[in-house]
Amino acid sequence: MATISAKLVKELREKTGAGMMDCKKALTETDGDIDKAIDYLREKGIAKAAKKADRIAAEGLVHVETKGSDAVIVEINSETDFVARNEGFQELVKEIANQVLDTKAETVEALMETTFPNGKSVDERIKEAISTIGEKLSVRRFAIRNKNDKDAFGAYLHMGGRIGVLAVVEGSTDEEAARDVAMHIAAINPKYVSSEQVSEEEINHEREVLKQQALNEGKPENIVEKMVEGRLRKYLQEICAVDQDFVKNPDVTVEAFLKTKGGKLVDFVRYEVGEGMEKREENFADEVKGQMK
């Protein structure tokens, strides 16, 4: 049997919102497999569908830059939020974003070797900034997207670059509408553009979880299947952008809103600073002690 560490319990709590003892029991029952533990909690009705997005860890900025038919979204990390608000750091982020577009680098490693017009490499420029700012800085990731003259980019930054979205709308040049959709994606955080992108494996997995959940609720077997399909449709609506109620007008879906502009959402990239990165341990030991009193 796997050892259930406090760190593992904490991670499960962050992903599900379930209580500490429920999380510990779920991990014990599933031999420490966190994904199975999430399903266990959901089947027992203890936790809602986990988005499986890890706690925000590192600081830094997300930035979106567009040039004609090309656009890039980039995340650059710093150690503290104080530095992320530094004007010099913000300028560095813009420089790097423009360098990605100018060089069409495909990986972070390749980008670091590219040179600016002054002959200085990106790697050298970042080391120079580290020396000036006094913190470790790093280019974490970026994504380039393209469009044609009949399409539009939607660029949106939330909380000064804490969250950034780059959306691609096909068939419409209405940049304001595309930006509104990018804002929706920043707020609601869908996983996919549409249900067509959801794998059969994920759908079948969700269907099985919902079935067990319904049976555990004591629902009669003859209505379970109908109930599961209804809940599955709701689940897909929650994770697919085009099917969601548009944040600026909940009376219509994102798809319907864009249709009034002659457009269609075909792609998006959403970055949130530090997502998926390890967060410092904070007060969890104190919380455990409190539970023992």
Curated annotation (Swiss-Prot):
InterPro entries assigned: EF-Ts_dimer_sf (IPR036402), Transl_elong_EFTs/EF1B (IPR001816), Transl_elong_EFTs/EF1B_dimer (IPR014039), Transl_elong_Ts_CS (IPR018101), UBA-like_sf (IPR009060)
Domain of life: Bacteria
UniProt-listed Pfam families: EF_TS
This protein's GO CC annotations: cytoplasm
Single annotated GO MF: translation elongation factor activity
Keywords: Cytoplasm, Elongation factor, Protein biosynthesis
Stretches for region Involved in Mg(2+) ion dislocation from EF-Tu: 80-83
Principal subcellular localisation of the protein: cytoplasm
Compartments reported by the entry: Cytoplasm
UniProt xrefs under HAMAP family: EF_Ts
Function noted in UniProt: Associates with the EF-Tu.GDP complex and induces the exchange of GDP to GTP. It remains bound to the aminoacyl-tRNA.EF-Tu.GTP complex up to the GTP hydrolysis stage on the ribosome.
Family stated for the protein in its record: Belongs to the EF-Ts family.
Protein's recorded name: Elongation factor Ts
Organism name: Staphylococcus aureus (strain bovine RF122 / ET3-1)
Lineage: Bacteria, Bacillati, Bacillota, Bacilli, Bacillales
